[in-house]
C-alpha cells in the first residue's frame, strides 16, 4: 500500500485554488469543480462534497486549529520571500526563521486556516554549510543529516561549474 495524497476540505474552492496557484505556484492536473488535484498529489474538496462523502454526518472541521500542515520546499527562499511579500493579506503564523539545523522556513495560513510551511530544501542548506567551509563532519552535526546525504551534496558541489 502507498500513500496517494492529502486532501484538504475548503469552504471556497475558487479562493483556495487561486491561493495555491498564485502563492505556491501549484499546477492543477485535474479539476472536477468540487474536487481539484494539484501536481504533487494533494487535493482540495469542497466542504459540501465532503459532507456528502460522509453520508451527511456532521463535519467537525478544525479550520485554523494548528494541528497539521502542508510542507513545501523551495531552493531559493529569498526569491520566495520576495514573491510572498506581494500577498500582504495572507496571515502569517511565524516569520521567516532559521532553525538549529540551518533550514529557514516560514509558516502561514491558507484561506481556510490550514497551516502552510515553505522551507529551504535541505540540499540547499547542506551545500550552504559546505560552501561556508564546514567539514563533512561539522555539516553532519549541524544539519543532523547522515554522512551519505552530506557526501552526495559535497560531490554535487565538486561536479558543478
Feature roles, as predicted:
Residues 25-31, 91-94:
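Short secondary-structure junctions
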Residues 27-64, 115-120, 159:
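Conserved short beta-strand elements that form part of the metal-binding/catalytic scaffold
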Residues 3, 8-9, 29-31, 80:
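Helical anchoring/docking segments at protein termini
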Residues 107-124:
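A contiguous, mid-protein "functional segment" used to position or interact
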Residues 12-14, 65-112, 132, 142-148, ...:
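Vicinal oxygen chelate
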Residues 1-15, 68-70, 121-160:
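N-terminal beta-strand motif that seeds the catalytic metal site of vicinal oxygen chelate
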Residues 12-27:
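Amphipathic alpha-helical segments
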Amino acid at each position: 500500500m502507498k500513500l496517494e495524497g492529502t486532501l484538504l476540505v475548503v469552504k471556497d474552492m475558487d479562493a483556495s485554488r487561486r491561493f495555491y496557484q498564485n502563492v505556491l505556484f501549484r499546477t492543477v492536473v485535474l479539476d472536477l469543480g468540487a474536487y481539484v488535484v494539484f501536481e504533487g498529489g494533494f487535493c482540495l474538496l469542497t466542504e459540501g462534497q465532503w459532507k456528502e462523502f460522509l453520508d451527511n454526518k456532521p463535519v467537525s472541521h478544525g479550520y485554523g486549529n494548528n494541528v497539521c500542515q502542508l510542507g513545501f520546499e523551495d531552493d531559493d527562499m529569498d526569491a520566495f520571500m520576495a514573491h510572498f511579500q506581494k500577498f500582504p493579506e495572507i496571515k502569517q503564523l511565524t516569520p521567516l526563521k532559521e532553525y538549529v539545523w540551518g533550514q529557514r522556513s516560514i509558516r502561514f495560513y491558507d484561506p481556510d486556516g490550514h497551516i502552510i510551511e515553505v522551507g529551504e530544501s535541505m540540499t540547499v542548506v547542506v551545500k550552504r554549510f559546505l560552501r561556508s567551509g564546514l567539514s563533512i563532519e561539522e555539516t553532519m552535526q549541524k544539519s543532523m543529516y547522515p554522512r551519505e546525504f552530506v557526501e552526495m551534496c559535497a560531490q554535487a558541489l565538486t561536479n558543478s561549474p
